[in-house]
Amino acid sequence: MSLKNIVSLPEYKSTLPSGLVVRYRPFVVKEEKILLMAKESKDMEQIYSCIKNVIKNCIIEPENLDIDKLPYFDVQQLFIHLRCKSMGESVQIRVKDPETKQSFETELDLEKIKITNITKKLQKIKLNENIAVEFRYPSFSDFLKISNKTDDVGLETLLSVAGICVNKVFTKEETINCTELPHEEILEFINTLPKKEFEKFCEFFKSMPKISYNSSFKNPVTGKAFPVEVTDFTDFFIL
């Protein structure tokens, strides 16, 4: 018998925020090494690419699951589940006291991470009496494009997200399927909107689902507790 056939890995099942049920195994040493190398590179594109490849390796069902097409929050949740089953439910993070500016190391419980603002319905927003827009949430591949932007939630990023995620535009006369239109045409439409209507776009995208961890930490020097909030997915990419 081959040595590689001796090892038997456990299998787990999880229901993702979108409702998709997946069956998976924990990642193994070779995959942990891939993640460590990505972490050390500090290159976000490489990190996300490695996360995608590790998830793809570990998924048993559904077969041939296209990670790129999953909602980005499904991939985030799935990776956190994989991390829990593979290496334990806690990681060490550094937190900063906003009052004293001191940094401390503390333990983060991965099982307490929540994904907020989730709805499984496509979002429809009425811009004015004549126009409404239906959005979809960004897929993981969309999320990678967005994450490469450098202006956080600035105008360029909001335009990029909006252009990617506009699903349909409704007028009194017709319904326009934007998935069949060039990206540039959608951006041109968005750029012609009055400021008040564009702000409705901004509010939607700023309230998209996100991972969230809320706790508190007691400063051992002052004895005062301060809140700890983590919302950036990369903060959980700690092995």
What name fits each language-model region?
Residues 1-239:
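Short, surface-exposed, charged amphipathic helix/loop patches that serve as local interaction elements
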